[in-house]
Amino acid sequence: MNRLELFNILQPIVKSVTGVSTVILANQVQSDGTGIPSPSGEYITIEPKQSVAQRGQANIHRNTSATPLSLDVDVRAQIIVEVDINVYRGVDAISRVSRLQECNKRPDVSSALRTNKLGWQRVSTPNNLTRMQSGNPEQRAQCYVYLYYETTDAVTINSIESASYGIEYEDGTVVATGSVPD
């Protein structure tokens, strides 16, 4: 799942839960490489892939291939993605971002996550980043949302239909030979 796909899934969820209508993808640039100006008023940015980690070991599925003498192997890795969410301006940024905690229990949110094959792990403790800007306090808050999803990497390999073997002592004396299937 790429950055834009994750953003398109999360944007309506964040809009609905926080009540902020302007939710944009973080770190956008124009075609000339310059950053886009920030929106006026209260807005939220989402960086869908702040970091990507794995959970445990990948699940490996093996099936007989439609190709003769082959085996289909599908490696399915469980991915944990850290999503950075920032609320800017408005009246109470910390309250807006704290609404994301446990929002996965809402039926509309859990349905959207399930439809898109995403799991909701948790939300970090919201950070109050309000600072004085040009003599005026500018509201800002941040949290991280941790999501699960599964990737798949399928490959077709040749199957081993038979194998020969030989067992020898270190001096070269043959103890046994054979083949499987025999």
Predicted regions and their residues:
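Small/polar-rich, solvent-exposed N-terminal microdomains that initiate assembly or binding
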Residues: M1-L69, S164-D182
